[in-house]
Amino acid sequence: AIAAGVILLWMGAAVRRLITEKGRRGRIVYRFVLTVVCTVLTVYAGFSLLWGVNYYAESFQEQSGVYARESTPEELARVTEYFARQLAGCADQVQRDENGLFAESRADIFAHSVRVFDGIYDEFPCLVMEDRVPKGVRFSTALSAMDFTGFYFPFTGEANLNIDSPACYLPSTIAHEMAHQRGIASEQECNFIAIAASTTAQSPAYRYSGWLMGFTYLSNALYRADQEAWKQVRVLLPDTVVADLRDNSAYWA
């Protein structure tokens, strides 16, 4: 916000000089364009140094030895069913409102974030680092308009989260952005890490959100592969989980 304010003030000053210093307009425009170009190049260079290099670094698969492979529809159905049963089993462990929707405090979710990776450090020591509490974005409705649930900002090293969207996915999304803080560039790898961390966390909210995120991706893939198998798995979900899924779909529609 401060940076945006500085840019607006600088642009306002440039416009004012164009109006008041008519004899020097050419020089003012030249300096304005030069400053913009230099600023863009500096930001690009900073982004490349602070984040872009991660696209060429050793991937999480290479660091961990866990590699993705193609699965059969039968394997996909079995794993999706497993996630559905785990999700159903922890659905009543989280706070809910009068409509049966996930109602855990966002403040508590953020507070518990610094311990979410503890359960997978032994298995994945490449992820060990000291965590900081991520930040909720004040203008989250703007993020929603752009279909963003969160983002990692490499210039500050902060994980920034949308706090306007349904909270049931907030814990696992926090874990996803915290995976980016560990230098993991791949979105799919960050999803895997987020699900692994969340489902083994001490916090019921994180466990539920982790199983929910995993089920969502698996269920979508199963629907594309075998709709009959998808229907058999879908009926395993309790009404509370279905309510969360529908609420999330309605929000993003």
Segments (PLM) and residue ranges:
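Membrane-embedded alpha-helical segments of integral membrane proteins
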Residues: 1-18
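Internal/C-terminal transmembrane anchor helices
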Residues: 27-54
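Membrane-interface segments at or immediately adjacent to transmembrane helices
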Residues: 52-119
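Membrane-interfacial, low-structure loops and terminal tails that flank and connect transmembrane helices
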Residues: 17-30
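Auxiliary, metal-adjacent structural segments of Zn-dependent hydrolase domains
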Residues: 94-167
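Post-HEXXH active-site segment of zinc metalloproteases
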Residues: 186-214
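Pan-zinc metallopeptidase signature
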Residues: 239-253
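Active-site recognition of the HExxH zinc-binding catalytic motif
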Residues: 170-196
